[in-house]
C-alpha cells in the first residue's frame, strides 16, 4: 500500500510521474495567448545548426559527381525492401509523390512553404494526413543521404529523387538545380490555418473559408493537413465541377495556371497508384504521435500485412493507368476512353471506376494478378470542367506538347521558391531563364568606384530631396524582398515598373517626384560614356545618402556601405500578375497598415521582419531609426516621437519609454500620448510604435537604444541593419 500510495509531490521527479511531463509544457503562450510571438525572428538559429560556423553548402554541393549520385538513386528506386516493398518493384511513383509534396506546400501570397529547406522532415509536415507513409520514402533514401552526407542536403535530395524517378520511368525532365540548404527545426512562422482538427471540413468552426468558399489568405490548401485539394472532392463531396473550382483556386495560389495545372495532374497521375486497401481505423498514429519504439515512423497499419497490397494512405484505392511505372499517354487514354461511375474504395473513399470496369486492368503491386483502374473526383474535373477538358484533349492529341508542358510545370513546381537563377547550382540547370524567375540582367563592365560614388552622392544631396524621401524610396525598393521564396528586393529596381510603381504602400506620387530626379543623375553620369550605374544601384545609393544626411543632422558623421552590381529589369521581364502578390498589405517599418490586412499591425510587423530575415534587435533599431528620420508612409507624424524629425538619433526610444507620457486609444487605430502633468497631447502613434514599450522583450531591446550612452551604437546598428535589407537579394555577394 505504501508503494502504490506515494504521490508525485513526494516521489523522485526522475523515476516517477514527475518525469512524464515535458519541461516547459505550460508555456507563456498558454497563459497569455495574445502575447506577441517574436520566435520567427530567431528561427533556425546557428546554435541549432550541427554543421557549424563556416559551412558552405553550395561549395560542398558543387563537389558532387551528379551522374554517380543519380545512378545510385536509380538503383535505390529498384531495390525493394521487405519492410516496405516497392509497388510494381519500383519506388519511382512513391518518390514523385515525395518530391511533389515537398514542393507543393508553397503558396504565392507570402512565399512560404515549398521545398527550399527540407522541412518535410519535421512536424507538422512529417505528420500531415496527406503525407501519409512518406516517412517510409525518406527512410528508403537514407542510404543515399548517408553516403553523400554534407554534400547533398535533404532539401535537394527530396526534389532530385523525383526527377530521377521520372527519368528512370521514361520521362525527359526540364532540368534540376541544387542549392537548397537544410534547416534544423520546423518553420513555425508559417500559418497553416485556424483549424484544430486534421482534415476539418469547411462547415466546422475555425473554418478557413469566408462566404462563397472564399479561401482566406495566405492559405492555398483546402483543408488542414492537405497539400492541395481533397481528391474525393470538396469536403469529401464527389462533385467534379465543384472539385474543379477548388483545383483552380488552389493551384493559382501556388502560381500555376490552368495549363500547368492539367499538366501536373495528368503527368503526376500517369505514375503509381493510390492506397486504400483496408479500414482506415486500423491505421495508427502519425510519426509525431507514434510510440518511441517506432523510431520516427508512423501510420502503422493493422490491416493484414499493413504494406504492399494491404497499404492504406489516402483511402482511395487503385492505379490510374495500366502502365503505372511508364511514361506514356495512358492517363488521357483512360480518362477519355471510358464512361465513369461513382463507387467507393475498400477504405470507404469516394472514387470513380469505368462503367466497363472489367475491360481495363492494371497489374497488382506485387505482380500477382490484375486490378481495376480508377480516377479520383479531382481527376474527373480534368474531363468535366470545360476549360480543363479543352486543355486535356489538346494534350491528348499532342503528346509532345503535353510532355513539354509537364516538364516545365514540374520544374516550376520544384524550383519556384529558390529565387533567381543565380542561386541555382549544378550542370543540369537549364540555360533558358523563365519569366517566373523574375529575371534581372546583370550590369556589364566595371562598377562605380569610391570616387564616382562620392560624386553621385554629392549630386543626390544637392537635389533638395529630403532624407525621408530618399530613405522611403530606397526602403520601398528593397523591402519588397521575401526571404521565404527569395523574390523581390532592390535588384532589378522593379519599383520603377508596374505593378510596384502603383502600390499604395510605395506612395506613387512620391515615386513620381523622386525617381525622375535620380534617373536624371544616372543619365548624366552614364552619358559620359565611362563607368555606368544602374537605376537599381542609384536608388540604393541615394537611400544611403538620406541615412547619412539624417545622421549628420544628429551630429554623427557616418558612411553607409554600398556595393554596386545590381541590374535593371524591364517591364517585359516582369510578370505583373505574378509580381503583384509581393505587394505589402502591412509594413510597420513605414507605419503602413491596410484595412484588409490579415492580422493585427504588430503581428504583421513581426511577419514583415521575418520575411526580411531580421532579428528582433534589427527590427527594433530599424523602426526607431526610420521614425526618427520621419520615413513613415506619406510622411505621417504618427510614431515620429521626436522634436527633431529628419535627425537619426535615439529620440524615438527615449520617448516611447518615457513615463512622462500617458497613452490612450482614440476612436481610430491611432493612440494619443498626453503629457502626464499637463494633459496636453504630445504625440500620436500606432500599436506598432507602442509595442516597443508594451511588449516586455521589445521593451528590453528598446531600453538598450534609449540609454544615454547608446546613440552612437543605435546609429551604427541602424546602418548595419539598413545595409542588410538593401543587400538581401544580392546573391552575388551571399547565398
From Swiss-Prot:
Pfam families: peroxidase. One of its GO terms (biological process) is cellular response to hydrogen peroxide. Homodimer or homotetramer. One of its GO terms (cellular component) is cytosol. Formation of the three residue Trp-Tyr-Met cross-link is important for the catalase, but not the peroxidase activity of the enzyme. Residues 1-10 have a biased composition (Polar residues). Belongs to the peroxidase family. Peroxidase/catalase subfamily. Its cofactor is heme b. InterPro entries: Catalase_peroxidase, Haem_peroxidase, Haem_peroxidase_sf, Peroxidases_AS, Peroxidases_heam-ligand_BS. The lineage of its organism: Bacteria, Pseudomonadati, Pseudomonadota, Alphaproteobacteria, Rhodobacterales. There is a cross-link at residues 228-254 (Tryptophyl-tyrosyl-methioninium (Tyr-Met) (with W-100)). Binds 1 heme b (iron(II)-protoporphyrin IX) group per dimer. It is an enzyme of class 1 (oxidoreductase). GO terms for molecular function: catalase activity; heme binding; metal ion binding. Keywords: Heme, Hydrogen peroxide, Iron, Metal-binding, Oxidoreductase, Peroxidase. Bifunctional enzyme with both catalase and broad-spectrum peroxidase activity. The record marks 97 as: Transition state stabilizer. It comes from Jannaschia sp. (strain CCS1). This is Catalase-peroxidase. Its EC number is 1.11.1.21.
Amino acid at each position: 500500500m505504501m508503494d502504490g500510495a506515494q504521490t508525485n509531490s513526494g516521489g523522485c521527479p526522475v523515476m516517477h510521474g514527475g518525469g512524464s511531463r515535458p519541461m516547459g509544457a505550460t508555456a507563456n503562450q498558454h497563459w497569455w495567448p495574445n502575447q506577441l510571438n517574436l520566435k520567427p525572428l530567431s528561427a533556425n538559429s546557428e546554435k541549432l545548426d550541427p554543421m557549424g560556423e563556416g559551412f558552405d553548402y553550395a561549395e560542398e554541393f558543387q563537389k558532387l559527381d551528379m551522374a554517380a549520385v543519380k545512378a545510385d538513386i536509380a538503383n535505390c528506386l529498384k531495390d525493394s525492401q521487405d519492410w516496405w516493398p516497392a509497388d510494381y518493384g519500383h519506388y519511382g511513383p512513391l518518390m514523385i509523390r515525395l518530391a511533389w509534396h515537398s514542393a507543393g506546400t508553397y503558396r504565392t501570397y507570402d512565399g512560404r512553404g515549398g521545398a527550399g529547406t527540407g522541412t518535410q522532415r519535421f512536424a507538422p509536415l512529417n505528420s500531415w494526413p496527406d503525407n501519409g507513409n512518406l516517412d517510409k520514402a525518406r527512410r528508403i533514401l537514407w542510404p543515399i543521404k548517408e553516403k553523400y552526407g554534407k554534400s547533398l542536403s535533404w532539401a535537394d535530395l527530396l526534389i532530385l529523387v523525383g526527377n530521377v524517378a521520372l527519368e528512370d520511368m521514361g520521362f525527359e525532365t526540364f532540368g534540376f538545380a541544387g542549392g537548397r540548404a537544410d534547416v534544423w527545426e520546423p518553420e513555425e512562422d508559417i500559418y497553416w490555418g485556424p483549424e484544430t482538427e486534421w482534415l476539418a471540413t469547411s462547415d466546422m468552426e475555425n473554418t478557413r473559408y469566408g462566404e462563397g468558399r472564399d479561401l482566406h489568405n495566405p492559405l492555398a490548401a483546402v483543408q488542414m493537413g492537405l497539400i492541395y485539394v481533397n481528391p474525393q472532392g470538396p469536403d469529401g463531396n464527389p462533385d467534379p465541377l465543384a472539385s474543379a473550382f477548388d483545383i483552380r483556386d488552389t493551384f493559382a495560389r501556388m502560381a500555376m495556371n490552368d495549363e500547368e495545372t492539367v499538366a501536373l495532374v495528368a503527368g503526376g497521375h500517369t505514375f503509381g497508384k493510390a492506397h486504400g486497401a483496408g479500414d482506415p481505423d486500423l491505421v495508427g498514429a502519425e510519426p509525431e504521435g507514434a510510440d518511441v519504439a517506432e523510431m520516427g515512423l508512423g501510420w502503422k497499419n493493422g490491416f493484414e500485412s499493413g504494406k504492399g497490397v494491404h497499404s492504406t494512405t489516402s483511402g482511395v484505392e487503385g492505379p490510374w493507368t495500366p502502365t503505372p511505372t511508364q511514361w506514356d499517354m495512358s492517363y488521357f487514354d483512360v480518362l477519355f476512353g471510358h464512361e465513369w461511375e461513382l463507387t467507393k474504395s475498400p477504405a470507404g473513399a469516394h472514387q470513380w471506376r469505368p462503367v466497363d470496369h472489367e475491360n481495363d486492368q492494371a497489374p497488382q503491386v506485387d505482380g500477382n494478378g490484375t486490378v481495376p483502374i480508377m480516377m479520383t473526383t479531382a481527376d474527373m474535373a480534368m474531363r468535366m470542367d470545360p476549360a480543363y477538358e479543352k486543355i486535356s484533349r489538346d494534350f491528348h492529341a499532342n503528346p509532345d506538347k503535353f510532355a513539354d508542358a509537364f516538364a516545365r510545370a514540374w520544374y516550376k513546381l520544384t524550383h519556384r521558391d529558390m529565387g533567381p537563377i543565380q542561386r541555382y547550382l549544378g550542370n543540369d540547370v537549364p540555360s533558358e531563364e523563365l519569366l517566373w524567375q523574375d529575371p534581372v540582367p546583370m550590369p556589364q563592365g566595371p562598377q562605380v568606384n569610391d570616387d564616382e560614388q562620392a560624386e553621385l552622392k554629392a549630386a543626390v544631396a544637392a537635389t533638395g530631396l529630403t532624407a525621408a524621401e530618399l530613405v522611403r524610396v530606397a526602403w520601398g525598393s528593397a523591402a519588397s524582398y521575401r526571404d521565404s521564396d527569395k523574390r523581390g528586393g532592390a535588384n532589378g529596381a522593379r519599383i520603377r515598373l508596374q505593378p510596384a510603381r502603383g502600390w499604395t504602400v510605395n506612395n506613387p506620387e512620391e515615386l513620381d517626384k523622386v525617381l525622375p530626379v535620380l534617373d536624371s543623375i544616372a543619365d548624366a553620369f552614364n552619358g559620359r560614356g565611362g563607368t555606368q550605374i544602374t537605376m537599381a544601384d542609384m536608388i540604393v545609393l541615394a537611400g544611403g545618402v538620406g541615412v547619412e544626411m539624417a545622421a549628420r543632422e544628429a551630429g554623427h558623421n557616418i558612411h553607409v556601405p554600398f556595393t554596386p552590381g545590381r541590374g535593371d529589369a524591364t517591364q517585359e521581364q516582369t510578370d505583373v500578375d505574378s509580381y503583384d502578390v509581393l505587394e505589402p498589405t502591412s509594413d510597420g517599418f513605414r507605419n503602413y497598415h491596410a484595412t484588409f490586412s490579415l492580422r493585427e499591425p504588430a503581428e504583421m510587423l513581426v511577419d514583415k521582419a521575418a520575411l526580411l530575415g531580421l532579428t528582433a534587435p534589427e527590427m527594433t533599431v530599424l523602426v526607431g531609426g526610420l521614425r526618427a528620420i520621419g520615413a513613415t508612409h506619406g510622411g505621417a507624424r504618427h510614431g515620429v516621437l521626436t522634436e527633431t524629425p529628419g535627425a537619426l538619433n535615439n529620440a524615438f526610444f527615449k520617448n516611447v519609454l518615457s513615463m512622462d507620457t500617458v497613452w490612450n486609444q482614440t476612436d481610430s487605430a491611432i493612440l494619443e500620448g498626453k503629457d502626464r502633468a499637463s494633459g496636453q497631447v504630445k504625440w500620436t502613434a500606432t500599436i506598432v510604435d507602442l509595442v516597443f514599450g508594451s511588449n516586455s522583450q521589445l521593451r528590453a531591446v528598446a531600453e538598450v537604444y534609449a540609454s544615454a550612452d547608446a546613440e552612437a551604437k543605435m546609429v551604427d546598428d541602424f546602418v548595419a541593419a539598413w545595409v542588410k535589407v538593401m543587400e538581401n537579394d544580392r546573391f552575388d555577394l551571399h547565398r
